[in-house]
């Protein structure tokens, strides 16, 4: 067995150890450390494998790109894990250990999706991740909103899986193979205008659109974000979407879909609709979680533009480096910023409404400053990491002469600026009621880390960009 499987094996061992701990003697502190140890060792092993040669078998492919995405995933998980112990002690009375177990199972599924190269391995790891998230979302079983969110996510997951299974079956009927690469070769070498083949592809895409909550498959996404426990919402918006988007990227990057105008038109329409509708719906919200839910729709709409670049001209497949760089930079920038946002919200004791943030600048200035920087980064304001992500996106579009989405991107960004600034204005409002207790040294350190990371990489992006370029190249 190849060493490339080591991170997944380490997480699997952590899952087994945690199961024994839960069965023999419950201990929240021990479960916390077992989870963290598993994630940290898996991340270190994944980093050590970045320089290893490309490895592929029938079900999985390990490349430098998948390695970096796996490190990004594990890094997000570790950062969120650091906040978990305190949050669970405050908000969950019983069965805290199961949260860590479900987190590790979801992590294992997400890692498998990132390296999947076959529809069989993709679907099994997708279901492992999705079923784990059902438990995580409905974890606060004493709260009706959490139970409702869990049922809604279960229904959406079932619908997405049904679409994907139907699409996979149709594609297999046409090609006789379930490999991603074979699908790409089939698109390149045969006539992809067959309506049955195209129908299969569209079914698969619809399933992935549900997983990414893109328009028009964004039903209940805000309800799920608001009803789930806050750490689950953080995991759902980062880990789940990263894994799902990587699969979508693979399908478009492996083959030239230029001849299949139906699929390309679908992606273009979904991208524009997600950019505009996501931000317009966010304008109407009074909950910070609902705002982040709808803004995530628009951000992944922006990312769809980069998928479109891979197939706008056939020559792109001979030199795909810059679109790939832009995609990896924007995806990393958005997920890092969003992880920072949820990390800050987990430290605050208020509710999920914007009112809970009123006067935060006067009671907890460091929390407010870090959350403001996160909002400015999500809005794409200069000197932040989010701005550099949008700069890469626009530069790639102009370089490859795909400029038609840019007016929609500008309009959507202007709309988004209003609700991001609204959050900052609420925090600047005067209030007479103080927020929670004094900050611990750990909280202060993590808040400064978020500020320095977003501002540092936004002001001096060369190191981050060069790292991405070396990986993609």
UniProtKB/Swiss-Prot annotation:
Class in the EC hierarchy, top level: translocase
EC number from the UniProt entry: 7.1.1.-
BP GO terms, sorted: ATP synthesis coupled electron transport
Entry's Gene Ontology cellular component terms: plasma membrane
GO molecular function, one term: quinone binding
Predominant cellular place of this UniProt entry's protein: membrane
TM regions (residue ranges): 3-23, 30-50, 62-82, 99-119, 120-140, 153-173, 195-215, 230-252, 262-282, 291-311, 326-346, 368-388, 408-428, 444-464
Entry keywords, A to Z: Cell inner membrane, Cell membrane, Membrane, NAD, Quinone, Translocase, Transmembrane, Transmembrane helix, Transport, Ubiquinone
Membrane topology category: Multi-pass membrane protein
Annotated compartments: Cell inner membrane
Subunit structure: NDH-1 is composed of 13 different subunits. Subunits NuoA, H, J, K, L, M, N constitute the membrane sector of the complex.
Family: Belongs to the complex I subunit 2 family.
Function: NDH-1 shuttles electrons from NADH, via FMN and iron-sulfur (Fe-S) centers, to quinones in the respiratory chain. The immediate electron acceptor for the enzyme in this species is believed to be ubiquinone. Couples the redox reaction to proton translocation (for every two electrons transferred, four hydrogen ions are translocated across the cytoplasmic membrane), and thus conserves the redox energy in a proton gradient.
Name the UniProt record assigns to this protein: NADH-quinone oxidoreductase subunit N
Lineage of the species this protein comes from: Bacteria, Pseudomonadati, Pseudomonadota, Gammaproteobacteria, Alteromonadales
Name of encoding gene: nuoN
């Amino acid at each position: 067995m190849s060493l490339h499987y080591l991170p997944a094996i380490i997480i699997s061992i952590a899952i087994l150890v945690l199961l024994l701990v839960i069965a023999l003697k419950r201990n929240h502190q021990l479960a916390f450390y077992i989870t963290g140890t598993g994630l940290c060792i898996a991340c270190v092993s994944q980093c050590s494998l970045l320089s290893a040669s490309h490895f592929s078998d029938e079900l999985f492919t390990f490349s430098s790109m998948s390695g970096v995405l796996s490190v990004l995933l594990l890094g997000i998980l570790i950062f969120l894990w650091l906040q978990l112990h305190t949050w669970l002690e405050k908000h969950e009375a019983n069965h805290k250990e199961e949260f860590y177990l479900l987190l590790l199972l979801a992590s294992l599924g997400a890692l498998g999706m990132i390296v999947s190269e076959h529809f069989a391995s993709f679907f099994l790891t997708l279901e492992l991740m999705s079923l784990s998230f059902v438990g995580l979302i409905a974890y606060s079983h004493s709260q009706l909103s959490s139970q409702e969110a869990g049922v809604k996510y279960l229904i959406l997951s079932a619908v997405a899986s049904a679409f994907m299974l139907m699409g996979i079956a149709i594609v297999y009927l046409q090609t006789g193979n379930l490999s991603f690469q074979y699908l790409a070769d089939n698109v390149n070498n045969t006539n992809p205008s067959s309506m049955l083949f195209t129908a299969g592809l569209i079914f698969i895409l619809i399933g992935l659109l549900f997983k990414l909550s893109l328009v028009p498959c964004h039903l209940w996404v805000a309800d799920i974000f608001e009803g789930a426990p806050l750490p689950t919402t953080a995991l759902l918006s980062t880990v789940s979407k990263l894994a799902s988007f990587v699969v979508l990227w693979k399908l478009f990057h492996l083959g030239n879909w230029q001849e299949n105008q139906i699929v390309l038109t679908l992606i273009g329409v979904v991208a524009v609709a997600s950019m505009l509708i996501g931000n317009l719906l966010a304008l109407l919200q009074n909950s910070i979680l609902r705002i982040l839910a709808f803004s995530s729709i628009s951000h992944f709409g922006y990312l769809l533009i980069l998928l479109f670049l891979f197939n706008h001209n056939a020559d792109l497949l001979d030199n795909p480096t810059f679109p790939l760089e832009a995609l990896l930079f924007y995806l990393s920038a958005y997920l890092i910023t969003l992880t920072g946002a949820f990390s800050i919200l987990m430290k605050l004791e208020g509710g999920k409404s914007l009112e809970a943030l009123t006067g935060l600048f006067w009671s907890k200035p460091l929390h407010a400053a870090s959350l403001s920087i996160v909002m400015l980064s999500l809005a794409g304001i200069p000197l932040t990491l989010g701005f550099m992500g949008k700069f890469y996106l626009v530069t790639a579009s102009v370089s490859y002469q795909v400029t038609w989405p840019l007016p929609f991107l500008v309009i959507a960004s202007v709309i988004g600026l209003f609700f991001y600034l609204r959050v900052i204005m609420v925090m600047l409002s005067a209030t007479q009621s103080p927020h929670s207790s004094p900050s611990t040294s750990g909280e202060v350190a993590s808040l400064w880390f978020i500020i320095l990371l977003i501002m540092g990489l936004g002001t001096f992006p060369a190191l981050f960009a060069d790292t991405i370029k070396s990986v993609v190249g």
